[in-house]
Amino acid sequence: MGPVMLDVLGCELDAEEREILQHPLTGGLILFSRNYHDPAQLRELVRQIRAASRHRLVVAVDQEGGRVQRFREGFTRLPAMQAFSALNPSAEAETLAQQAGWLMASEMIAMDIDISFAPVLDIGYGSAAIGERSFHEDPAIALQMARCFIRGMREAGMKTTGKHFPGHGAVSADSHKETPRDTRSEAEIRRHDMPIFQQLIAERALDAIMPAHVIYTEVDPRPASGSSHWLKTVLRQELGFDGVIFSDDLSMEGAAIMGSYAERGQAALDAGCDMILVCNNREGAVSVLDNLPAMEADRVARLYHRGDFTRQQLIDSSRWKETSVALDRLQGRWLNHKAAAGR
């Protein structure tokens, strides 16, 4: 399996995409809203992807909930992660978070999708890129909510991806549009943002981690996604993380500081990433495939899903029906809450 995860343009594969999926460096594919029309079409697209690739790819999506949910019509509308603790007593919030993790993962696995890049482990709501995607501004509450969500994901058969290490919650800039800079000291980042990652790693609750396209100016001039300090020294050696490290999308403006697409890809791999994402730029993805040396990304094969059920079996189950109703109710309460607050 190769170390490159890329995307496709539409709701079915074209000839060039079939060729790209055969490339030995291709190891994964991420789906977006543009790849979705309805559940039957999505399942057929994933079947085409599986058939076109020379080995089993890791098929991924961002189906977190709230504003980051690529597939909407035909799937349960998941509330933003902030909604669990913001609107419910702690015990009920924990139950809902676990059920949401289970339902999200189950709905994706029924489509033969391996992973959703979740959960978000960033602390606080101040970042434009994160906001309500964060479980809470209190690290202890965020940790407990994340534990519950992870428990649900794993119960369904999906591996977990914690993001965005070492923490994206304190910067207001959006790394999709620019390169955010976090000017806090390393000691402050370690005290406030990193403990949730550290604890979940110690509990072996994270199968993968995605670092932030953020420059922590007091620590390293490179974004964390291209920093051997953050990925090798801190994450691998100090925290003992043995799972998969993904780069975030190298097409994002936050990664542009690392050079051309090929240079960004090589920098992320040299820094310690196992798999690099190159999305929304076909020319950039082809440049990466054409210029990287041959290599394998063996760790990534650990991320295949373990579910064995159809969509019909899932939606016929009493658990899905009850959970879908509960989450839909919470989503309605959350939208009303935001409207009342003028958000």
Curated annotation (Swiss-Prot):
<dbReference type="Pfam" id="PF00933">
    <property type="entry name" value="Glyco_hydro_3"/>
</dbReference>
<dbReference type="GO" id="GO:0008360">
    <property type="term" value="P:regulation of cell shape"/>
</dbReference>
<keyword id="KW-0573">Peptidoglycan synthesis</keyword>
<feature type="binding site">
    <location>
        <position position="133"/>
    </location>
    <ligand>
        <name>substrate</name>
    </ligand>
</feature>
<keyword id="KW-0131">Cell cycle</keyword>
<keyword id="KW-0378">Hydrolase</keyword>
<feature type="binding site">
    <location>
        <position position="70"/>
    </location>
    <ligand>
        <name>substrate</name>
    </ligand>
</feature>
<keyword id="KW-0132">Cell division</keyword>
<dbReference type="InterPro" id="IPR001764">
    <property type="entry name" value="Glyco_hydro_3_N"/>
</dbReference>
<dbReference type="GO" id="GO:0004563">
    <property type="term" value="F:beta-N-acetylhexosaminidase activity"/>
</dbReference>
<dbReference type="InterPro" id="IPR050226">
    <property type="entry name" value="NagZ_Beta-hexosaminidase"/>
</dbReference>
<protein>
    <recommendedName>
        <fullName>Beta-hexosaminidase</fullName>
        <ecNumber>3.2.1.52</ecNumber>
    </recommendedName>
</protein>
<dbReference type="GO" id="GO:0009254">
    <property type="term" value="P:peptidoglycan turnover"/>
</dbReference>
<feature type="active site" description="Nucleophile">
    <location>
        <position position="248"/>
    </location>
</feature>
<comment type="function">
    <text>Plays a role in peptidoglycan recycling by cleaving the terminal beta-1,4-linked N-acetylglucosamine (GlcNAc) from peptide-linked peptidoglycan fragments, giving rise to free GlcNAc, anhydro-N-acetylmuramic acid and anhydro-N-acetylmuramic acid-linked peptides.</text>
</comment>
<dbReference type="InterPro" id="IPR017853">
    <property type="entry name" value="Glycoside_hydrolase_SF"/>
</dbReference>
<comment type="pathway">
    <text>Cell wall biogenesis; peptidoglycan recycling.</text>
</comment>
<dbReference type="GO" id="GO:0005975">
    <property type="term" value="P:carbohydrate metabolic process"/>
</dbReference>
<dbReference type="GO" id="GO:0005737">
    <property type="term" value="C:cytoplasm"/>
</dbReference>
<comment type="similarity">
    <text>Belongs to the glycosyl hydrolase 3 family. NagZ subfamily.</text>
</comment>
<keyword id="KW-0963">Cytoplasm</keyword>
<dbReference type="GO" id="GO:0051301">
    <property type="term" value="P:cell division"/>
</dbReference>
<keyword id="KW-0326">Glycosidase</keyword>
<keyword id="KW-0133">Cell shape</keyword>
<dbReference type="InterPro" id="IPR019800">
    <property type="entry name" value="Glyco_hydro_3_AS"/>
</dbReference>
<feature type="compositionally biased region" description="Basic and acidic residues">
    <location>
        <begin position="174"/>
        <end position="187"/>
    </location>
</feature>
<feature type="region of interest" description="Disordered">
    <location>
        <begin position="161"/>
        <end position="187"/>
    </location>
</feature>
<dbReference type="GO" id="GO:0009252">
    <property type="term" value="P:peptidoglycan biosynthetic process"/>
</dbReference>
<feature type="binding site">
    <location>
        <position position="62"/>
    </location>
    <ligand>
        <name>substrate</name>
    </ligand>
</feature>
<dbReference type="InterPro" id="IPR036962">
    <property type="entry name" value="Glyco_hydro_3_N_sf"/>
</dbReference>
<feature type="active site" description="Proton donor/acceptor">
    <location>
        <position position="176"/>
    </location>
</feature>
<feature type="site" description="Important for catalytic activity">
    <location>
        <position position="174"/>
    </location>
</feature>
<feature type="binding site">
    <location>
        <begin position="163"/>
        <end position="164"/>
    </location>
    <ligand>
        <name>substrate</name>
    </ligand>
</feature>
<dbReference type="GO" id="GO:0071555">
    <property type="term" value="P:cell wall organization"/>
</dbReference>
<keyword id="KW-0961">Cell wall biogenesis/degradation</keyword>
<dbReference type="InterPro" id="IPR022956">
    <property type="entry name" value="Beta_hexosaminidase_bac"/>
</dbReference>
